């Protein structure tokens, strides 16, 4: 059974006079990976987060967030669905820490209204996998609420709010390709057909995208702590890769297997443990799939496209 929890607001909460919206907003938001991820020093003013210089890429593994307005005073509710909930399924006691709920609260505070919204999240992006699933859920919630409440705020305003919640969330609002700096929250989009996108294609970041996923998860703080000890390996485009592999050796085995099978690129996604492999064509993709299956170096294989973008739909 999907975990469901509802939090009504207090009796002292301000009366909200807006009429209940009759519509439901559904947002499909893709996962993210990092084509490059350079990690710099930690900054106290950023709460100990590290300086990052990255190229984000949205890949076609989608979580779906559905938002429906509730009666004034009803508070929020959250329902989680899907076969790959990870530790989210055991977090019923504190749904207020869910990224989507935090995003809902942030939007409500910025809009000066109550978070009387029913959220349903269908999870397909692996949890704790370095694929930005929580960030995708938060971004999808912000996009949904922006439409549900008819705020019509521009992306830049949404990104300002998202930056207070997490590093990847500002990127996930738009997906595609983008540069990320600061602690990852400062986004410069890479336009389709631009010189920068063509350069990435020439480097082999095109064609089939394969994700090797795992039942196990990695804690992002633990990966960064390990990075502070072991540093980055020479030649790694992802500075966190060595740390992730030291904590989850199968990721390294999956990278080696994909590379030997002809992957254009194979690397740990973000803080791991998921591995992303780019294949130039269908034949290369099939070789990678076969070797991953034969060697059992991953638990689940996902085929995806890139770069992808969020999709928003409205139902009366």
UniProtKB/Swiss-Prot annotation:
It catalyses: 4-CDP-2-C-methyl-D-erythritol + ATP = 4-CDP-2-C-methyl-D-erythritol 2-phosphate + ADP + H(+). Belongs to the GHMP kinase family. IspE subfamily. ATP binds at residues 126-136. Catalyzes the phosphorylation of the position 2 hydroxy group of 4-diphosphocytidyl-2C-methyl-D-erythritol. It comes from the Bacteria. Keywords: ATP-binding, Isoprene biosynthesis, Kinase, Nucleotide-binding, Transferase. This is 4-diphosphocytidyl-2-C-methyl-D-erythritol kinase. GO terms for biological process: isopentenyl diphosphate biosynthetic process, methylerythritol 4-phosphate pathway; terpenoid biosynthetic process. GO terms for molecular function: 4-(cytidine 5'-diphospho)-2-C-methyl-D-erythritol kinase activity; ATP binding. It comes from Bifidobacterium longum (strain NCC 2705).
């Amino acid at each position: 059974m999907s975990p469901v929890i509802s939090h009504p607001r207090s009796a002292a909460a301000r009366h909200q006079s807006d009429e209940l919206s009759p519509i439901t907003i559904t947002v499909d938001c893709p996962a993210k990976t990092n084509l490059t991820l350079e990690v710099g020093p930690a900054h106290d003013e950023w709460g100990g987060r590290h300086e990052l210089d990255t190229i984000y890429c949205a890949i076609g593994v989608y979580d779906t967030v559905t938002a429906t307005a509730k009666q004034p005073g009803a508070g929020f509710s959250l329902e989680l669905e899907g076969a790959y909930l990870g530790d989210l399924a055991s977090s019923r006691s504190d749904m207020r820490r869910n990224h989507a709920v935090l995003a809902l609260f942030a939007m409500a505070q910025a809009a000066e209204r109550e978070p009387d919204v029913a959220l349903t999240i269908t999870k397909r992006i692996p949890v704790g996998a370095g694929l930005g699933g929580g960030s995708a859920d938060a971004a999808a919630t912000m996009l949904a609420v922006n439409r549900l409440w008819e705020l019509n705020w521009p992306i830049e305003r949404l990104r300002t709010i998202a930056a207070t919640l997490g590093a990847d969330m500002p990127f996930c609002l738009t997906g595609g390709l983008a540069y990320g700096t600061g602690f990852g929250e400062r986004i410069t989009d890479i336009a389709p057909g631009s010189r920068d996108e063509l350069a990435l294609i020439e480097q082999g970041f095109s064609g089939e995208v394969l994700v090797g996923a795992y039942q196990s998860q990695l804690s992002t703080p633990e990966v960064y702590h390990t990075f502070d000890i072991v540093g980055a390996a020479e030649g790694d485009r992802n500075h966190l890769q060595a740390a992730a592999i030291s904590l989850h050796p199968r990721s390294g085995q999956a990278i080696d297997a994909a590379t030997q099978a002809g992957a254009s690129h194979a690397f740990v996604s973000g803080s791991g443990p998921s591995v992303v492999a780019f294949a130039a064509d269908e034949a290369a993709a099939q070789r990678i799939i076969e070797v991953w299956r034969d060697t059992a170096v991953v638990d689940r294989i996902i085929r995806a496209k890139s770069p992808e973008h969020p999709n928003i739909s409205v139902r009366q």
